[in-house]
């Protein structure tokens, strides 16, 4: 199983993008320049018609991608043309994986250099079949923990976790306000008592100020909505500068 610590030094810069937004050409050009960016780990969002975990900005970006005909097949074709030293993670809804076929999807993802899957609406209790395939192909199925998750459940969730722990720093959908820092610190401490895996904080982290604050709390910071916003105007040089600004030390 991949050790995500090898992709960063002190703290991981984790970004999220919707593949196909504003179009596949921009996504491909961005991925070709990924190694020149401060991003250590990139979550690749696969557009889905019913994105229950996503806020308005990400949901709108997914709709634009879908309206242009972006699907899992065009995503796979795009990734087959990409070479990068950075870690690539799929953020994908379970229905897409299920429709494609669990083993077929995981095997294909592995062949394209994907290190891990984040499946936001898949509960721990329903994840056995996908875990089996991920273990077979040495891909991490990422465990999500919320600040509101009770301690006993945290223990259960992280016991067999792989890759990293995704700590949800806000309650609800993406792009909302982050919870108090002290609450997060307590949650990180609690999670650390059960696992040695790195803990990355996401949901509600919007700017460089937030990033700097969260670096003191966890092993890495995940920025989603603000990164997706960078892509709206479509100019790659501006996108790269905006991303530099979000993750600057």
Swiss-Prot record:
Cysteine-cysteine disulfides: none
Assembly and binders: Tetramer of two alpha and two beta chains.
Q: What class of enzyme is it?
A: lyase
| Natural source organism | Campylobacter jejuni subsp. jejuni serotype O:2 (strain ATCC 700819 / NCTC 11168)
Q: Which Pfam families match?
A: Trp_syntA (PF00290)
> What protein family is recorded?
Belongs to the TrpA family.
Q: Point out the gene that encodes the protein.
A: trpA
Q: Which GO terms describe its molecular function?
A: tryptophan synthase activity
Question: What's the domain of life for this entry?
Answer: Bacteria
What does UniProt list as catalytic? Answer: 43 (proton acceptor), 54 (proton acceptor)
Q: Which reaction does it catalyse?
A: (1S,2R)-1-C-(indol-3-yl)glycerol 3-phosphate + L-serine = D-glyceraldehyde 3-phosphate + L-tryptophan + H2O
The record's PROSITE patterns line, in alphabetical order, gives:
TRP_SYNTHASE_ALPHA
Q: Which UniProt keywords apply?
A: Amino-acid biosynthesis, Aromatic amino acid biosynthesis, Lyase, Tryptophan biosynthesis
Enzyme Commission number, as recorded = 4.2.1.20
A cellular component annotation (GO) from this entry: cytosol
Tell me the function of this protein. Answer: The alpha subunit is responsible for the aldol cleavage of indoleglycerol phosphate to indole and glyceraldehyde 3-phosphate.
Protein name (record): Tryptophan synthase alpha chain
Q: Which InterPro entries match?
A: Aldolase_TIM (IPR013785), RibuloseP-bd_barrel (IPR011060), Trp_synthase_alpha_AS (IPR018204), Trp_synthase_suA (IPR002028)
Biochemical pathway: Amino-acid biosynthesis; L-tryptophan biosynthesis; L-tryptophan from chorismate: step 5/5
* SUPFAM superfamilies attached to this UniProt entry: Ribulose-phoshate binding barrel
């Amino acid at each position: 199983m991949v050790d995500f610590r090898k992709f960063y030094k002190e703290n991981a810069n984790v970004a999220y993008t919707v593949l196909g937004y504003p179009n596949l050409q921009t996504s491909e050009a961005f991925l070709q320049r990924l190694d020149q960016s401060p991003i250590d780990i990139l979550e690749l969002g696969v557009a889905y018609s019913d994105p229950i975990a996503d806020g308005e900005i990400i949901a709108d970006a997914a709709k634009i991608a879908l309206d242009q005909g972006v699907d899992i097949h065009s995503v796979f074709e795009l990734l087959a043309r990409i070479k990068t030293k950075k870690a690539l993670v799929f953020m994908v809804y379970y229905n897409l994986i299920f429709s494609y076929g669990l083993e077929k999807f995981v095997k294909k993802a592995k062949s394209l250099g994907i290190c891990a899957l984040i499946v936001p609406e898949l509960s721990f209790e329903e994840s056995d079949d996908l875990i089996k395939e991920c273990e077979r192909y040495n891909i991490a199925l990422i465990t999500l923990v919320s600040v509101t998750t009770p301690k006993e459940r945290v223990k259960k969730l992280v016991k067999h976790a792989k890759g990293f722990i995704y700590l949800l720093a806000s309650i609800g959908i993406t792009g909302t306000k982050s919870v108090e820092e002290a609450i997060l610190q307590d949650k990180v401490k609690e999670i650390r008592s059960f696992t040695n895996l790195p803990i990355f904080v996401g949901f509600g982290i919007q700017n460089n100020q937030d990033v700097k604050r969260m670096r003191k709390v966890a092993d890495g910071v995940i920025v989603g909505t603000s990164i997706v916003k960078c892509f709206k105007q479509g100019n790659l040089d501006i996108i790269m500068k905006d991303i530099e600004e979000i993750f600057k030390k």
